[in-house]
Amino acid sequence: AYYGQNFNGEGTMKLLYGEYPGQDFNFPYMAPGWSPLMNNQSTITQSSSSIYDSYPWYYYYLIIGNANAVINRIDKAEGSQEEKDFLKAEALTFRAYSFFRLAELYCEPWARSNDGATDGVVLRIKEVAEAGEETDLKLSTLAETYKQVYDDLDEALRLYEVSGLTRDDIYWDATSNISFPDAPVAHAIYARAALTRQDYAVAKEHAALARANFPLMDTNTYYSGFCTPSSEWIWGVYNDASETIWYYGWQLFMACNGYYAQQNINVCINRDLVESFADSDIRKGLFLTESTFLPEDGSK
């Protein structure tokens, strides 16, 4: 299948698959051409033969394939053992995240899985060049999928620790290193996966470890637009001036002054929902309402 500019990796995953339209998030019908697609009301997004159905599968297995190549070859690469341990840990983190996201998108929820007995995903953990006849794999169970996620993250966390390095040490000269995983990122993915698996004690443990050095943002930062990493931002999509995702950047769609907003493709919240917020509710300040720009007496 051909995936065009609409499909640009994690930006697309967050925009089309990570946000489910509802009263708090909706593309109004005045948004020309985009509303049915973005609101998941189009037959295009509902069809099992659609590229919108297959793209996450293609995208995450592409990451898994790259991760397998790193895991398989890193020991023979040049560099210190500490650097190689860290890079292998990153590859394991990416692979665990990808298996987890595939399970979220293509598998039954854990609550309906008969304790993980339903179908999981294909667990490709060998590089194709090394797999031989093992390339034609069957689906795992959902329990086996989550076990692989846990195993990858356990090994990643072990390697992060023995390396003694952080992403600041490895990517010290990068414009931004927020997109590169390290131990806190692995803990965060572990927490999300465990929460989705209803493994609540494990989720609580790893969530605390993930957040340890990421204090919550203050009110001013909360209202600053979410366009740059804040103190509580653990992991994010790579972006700098030389490598952007152009038309499908999150803020191009979501920001009130973004490109698509200027083309009358605005994201909105249901009026009844936003008016139900108390004036003291910090979320209310994120939305433009009549009271935002009209005099209190309602005159124009």
Describe the function of each predicted region:
Residues 105-147:
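Short coil/linker segments at helix-helix boundaries
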Residues 80-84, 161-177:
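Short helix/loop segment immediately N-terminal to the Walker
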Residues 154, 160, 183-184, 189-217:
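Aromatic-residue-lined binding/catalytic grooves and analogous aromatic/hydrophobic interfacial grooves
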Residues 6-12, 17, 38, 162, ...:
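Hydrophobic-face positions in mid-chain alpha helices that act as interaction patches
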Residues 31-107, 136, 140, 158-161:
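Conserved, well-structured interaction surfaces
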Residues 103-110, 164, 196-198:
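Short coil/turn linking the two alpha-helices of tandem helical-hairpin repeats
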